[in-house]
């Protein structure tokens, strides 16, 4: 930390807790207080993590290239492109200046949203291997249950979470791609907070438009319209049957229409969708990989 910020730790912080409050494979987080009296969270990369990831990513790249060479039937999955997408994401994740910039951008996007907050970045105490943000005084979202909050507040929290997710994806095209419960917090007023901005995704305007039309089509149970959007977006080979594809979509949509989200198996749904991509020889859409991963995690939350 001192080497990265080129200052003694007792000059950077009036108080610094040596015991990490959170730890993961890439970094750990410490609670601290600045000389100005601000409570902050300090994220520090683990020593040697860059070299360790470089080895793992080289192996993943080699495996993807081998699959494309030796398994023609799997080339539609674009394994090399998929791995390159992951590599770009990891490279950004290993530079905490990029993570700080992502937090800053997300905070700016939701500056007018009173029920959602993103911690402020302390740029004077942030570098490639260290990031300092304001402290979020809130409880982990897993602690929020019908036993701990009243029904109205619980509804508000769920509505805020859903609204924030869809605004990120459909309005801004810039979304938090690691929205698991460990990164979600709720304060005593029901305000939702996000932390850990190392994995972020982006969607261009066309992809946002197509995604919104697909979601609306499913809500309206207009499977022909959903099929047409898939063809317009180039998600399905043009020689495929549009009617058969609409029929396949109906087989996915109708069984879950009107069900509570808790009664829908995300795993079974994904398995069925994957069968459809195989049946219609649909290539992997690498720009959507992070979104697909995020939607699986959000469904779990």
Task: For the regions a language model picked out, list residue spans one by one.
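Conserved catalytic cores of large enzyme domains
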Residues: 1-301
């Amino acid at each position: 930390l001192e080497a990265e910020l080129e200052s003694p730790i007792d000059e950077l912080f009036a108080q610094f807790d040596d015991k990490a409050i959170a730890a993961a494979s890439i970094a750990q987080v410490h609670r601290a207080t600045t000389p100005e009296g601000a409570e902050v969270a300090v994220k520090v990369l683990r020593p040697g993590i860059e070299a360790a990831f470089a080895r793992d990513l080289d192996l993943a790249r080699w495996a993807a290239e081998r699959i494309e060479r030796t398994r023609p039937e799997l080339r539609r999955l674009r394994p090399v492109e998929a791995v390159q997408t992951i590599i770009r994401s990891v490279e950004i994740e290993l530079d905490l200046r990029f993570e700080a910039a992502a937090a800053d951008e997300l905070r700016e996007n939701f500056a007018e949203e009173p029920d959602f907050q993103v911690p402020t970045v302390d740029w004077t105490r942030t570098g490639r291997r260290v990031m300092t943000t304001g402290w979020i005084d809130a409880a982990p979202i897993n602690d929020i249950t019908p036993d701990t909050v009243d029904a109205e507040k619980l509804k508000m929290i769920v509505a805020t979470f859903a609204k924030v997710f869809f605004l990120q994806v459909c309005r801004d095209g810039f979304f938090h791609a690691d929205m698991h419960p460990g990164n979600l917090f709720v304060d005593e007023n029901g305000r939702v907070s996000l932390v850990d901005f190392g994995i972020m995704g982006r969607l261009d305007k066309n992809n946002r438009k197509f995604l919104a039309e697909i979601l609306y089509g499913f809500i309206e149970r207009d499977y022909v319209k959903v099929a047409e959007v898939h063809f317009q977006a180039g998600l399905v080979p043009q020689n495929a049957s549009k009617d058969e594809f609409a029929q396949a979509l109906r087989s996915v949509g109708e069984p879950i229409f009107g069900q509570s989200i808790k009664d829908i198996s995300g795993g079974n749904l994904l398995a069925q969708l994957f069968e459809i991509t195989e049946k219609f020889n649909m290539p992997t859409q690498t720009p959507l990989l992070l979104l697909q991963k995020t939607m699986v995690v959000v469904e779990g939350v």
